[in-house]
Amino acid sequence: MLKLFSAFRKNKIWDFNGGIHPPEMKTQSNGTPLRQVPLAQRFVIPLKQHIGAEGELCVSVGDKVLRGQPLTRGRGKMLPVHAPTSGTVTAIAPHSTAHPSALAELSVIIDADGEDCWIPRDGWADYRSRSREELIERIHQFGVAGLGGAGFPTGVKLQGGGDKIETLIINAAECEPYITADDRLMQDCAAQVVEGIRILAHILQPREILIGIEDNKPQAISMLRAVLADSHDISLRVIPTKYPSGGAKQLTYILTGKQVPHGGRSSDIGVLMQNVGTAYAVKRAVIDGEPITERVVTLTGEAIARPGNVWARLGTPVRHLLNDAGFCPSADQMVIMGGPLMGFTLPWLDVPVVKITNCLLAPSANELGEPQEEQSCIRCSACADACPADLLPQQLYWFSKGQQHDKATTHNIADCIECGACAWVCPSNIPLVQYFRQEKAEIAAIRQEEKRAAEAKARFEARQARLEREKAARLERHKSAAVQPAAKDKDAIAAALARVKEKQAQATQPIVIKAGERPDNSAIIAAREARKAQARAKQAELQQTNDAATVADPRKTAVEAAIARAKARKLEQQQANAEPEEQIDPRKAAVEAAIARAKARKLEQQQANAEPEEQIDPRKAAVEAAIARAKARKLEQQQANAEPEEQIDPRKAAVEAAIARAKARKLEQQQANAEPEEQIDPRKAAVAAAIARVQAKKAAQQKVVNED
């Protein structure tokens, strides 16, 4: 009894909520064996036939290719595509592909040569001696993807499963009406399918392997049981026919009773699912060394004279397959890629067969029925009762129609598997799946835009942070440079510290003065004189710096000198015409003489700092020196011939002496700055200087006599 209960629990199956039972219409195509289709003249191979980015091209126009030769390189999640036959690459250009909107994707166009030559094939019959990583890499590089309709790269899926997979499920349900590709494949190639399952099991090492198949496929069930007769590691589970029991989440629940969490994957609960066609492709890739270049496609519908299942090369135009099956189109003929519930209408018949193409349905007008007009939702809740994902399709319909993306996301529109059960039972003929597909596409576009905005914001904030760091570092460097004293300041600080230490040392030593002697203040006096000399030197340095910063214009200096000479002549005339009884204040005369000397010194300094390119003409300087000497002689004669009682004005004498000294200094500087080839006679200059000194001495003596 215990064994009976254990066996019952082991073979237990669960049932999911919702689902429908549409007419199966499978007998049109599942009664004939698989057959080959003649090669087309031209093949169009899209670079992207899977979920993920397209691979990198490794062929160019004009190249000769063989069947199975890679057309792209598969790196990361990029899955390569291979040439379906031998021929020549005639173009690499965008071409409309299997998409409801007939979007153009980059494709390789090959003209077949009719020979259908393979590349050298290297099969791994002893695959059990290979490592897990080698097998996964081979499956990936041979272009194997999920052939059940999703198109997810099989190698990536196996790699992501890792060691946490406890249950491997092989999906053989094939629940959608009209489609019999997997059914016929299991009938004709059951042994190869089981061998592919064993390869997957060798890679994943699961605890149990389950094959889920609906009870409407008796021939396939018989063939699998015959192959698995001596196997105890693979369990065949026959489940009731119900749509959509072939969905990944639905079949997982039917066989294990586990539900995939919202927003999660089946691997999160230790389950990995593969399609029957995928298992067969894995066997051919690993054991036979053949990349995926063809797949089983169901050709069905009353508009096809010879329905059945064929081996269709990837890239074959749909028109070629239909014509080979006796396609008899009617007016406004519709061709559906996929099933009647989850498929889509082809915009034209030149689109190619890709890896996810499992059925081409060409229904007649009787099968389609009269077109029904879309009406308003009556909120009957029939769609909610039929939904296998436990969603509220009527609410999602209103949210999708009203562009309420947040509410649609809150109501888990992402969990919709687009099975079409809600649209099938809707009495108002509302194409709910179309609304849901459009809404999910808009939400995906919004999220992509938000992602780009977030990345742009992150880049901007990183840039701002970098600028702030650079600014802070720059301010810190400036602050450190400002705090650090300069070399001159260091010397001054060191000298001050030395003086302080010296004073402290002197203060600690007692000063002893003997009786009758004066204290020795020579050190203090010398220090005071040194400080005064240092102050004068600093003052002179500062004055030179200021004068160098504001160099006087030589022409302006000459004008000022002329004005000074004019003022001196005017002063002489006024003094000569003054009344004899008017007495001049000697202190005022001394002040004026000092002012004249200061102006003369300033004039000398400005001339010394004048620009070198504006040198004074040495001939002009010599003329002025001669004029000065003549004036000095004339002054001597006047003084000698003057009457004894005539009193000489001391102010005039002082001014003349100052002017004479200024002229003498100016003459010396002009001679020093003159060009080498125009040097003035040094003897003449010495004579002029001596005359000037004599005149100054005479003026001083005369001043003393007058004061007496």
Swiss-Prot record:
One of its GO terms (biological process) is electron transport chain. HAMAP family: RsxC_RnfC. [4Fe-4S] cluster 2 binds at C387, C416, C419, C422. InterPro entries: 4Fe4S_Fe-S-bd, 4Fe4S_Fe_S_CS, Ion_transpt_RnfC/RsxC, Nuo51_FMN-bd, Nuo51_FMN-bd_sf, RnfC_N, Soluble_ligand-bd. [4Fe-4S] cluster 1 binds at C377, C380, C383, C426. GO terms for molecular function: 4 iron, 4 sulfur cluster binding; electron transfer activity; metal ion binding. Binds 2 [4Fe-4S] clusters per subunit. It is found in: Cell inner membrane. Keywords: 4Fe-4S, Cell inner membrane, Cell membrane, Electron transport, Iron, Iron-sulfur, Membrane, Metal-binding, Repeat, Translocase, Transport. Part of a membrane-bound complex that couples electron transfer with translocation of ions across the membrane. Required to maintain the reduced state of SoxR. Residues 369-397, 407-436 form the 4Fe-4S ferredoxin-type domain. Its EC number is 7.-.-.-. It comes from the Bacteria. Residues 630-682 are annotated as: Disordered. Its cofactor is [4Fe-4S] cluster. It is a peripheral membrane protein. Pfam families: Complex1_51K, Fer4_7, RnfC_N, SLBB. The complex is composed of six subunits: RsxA, RsxB, RsxC, RsxD, RsxE and RsxG. GO terms for cellular component: plasma membrane. Its main location: membrane. This is Ion-translocating oxidoreductase complex subunit C. The gene is rsxC. Belongs to the 4Fe4S bacterial-type ferredoxin family. RnfC subfamily.
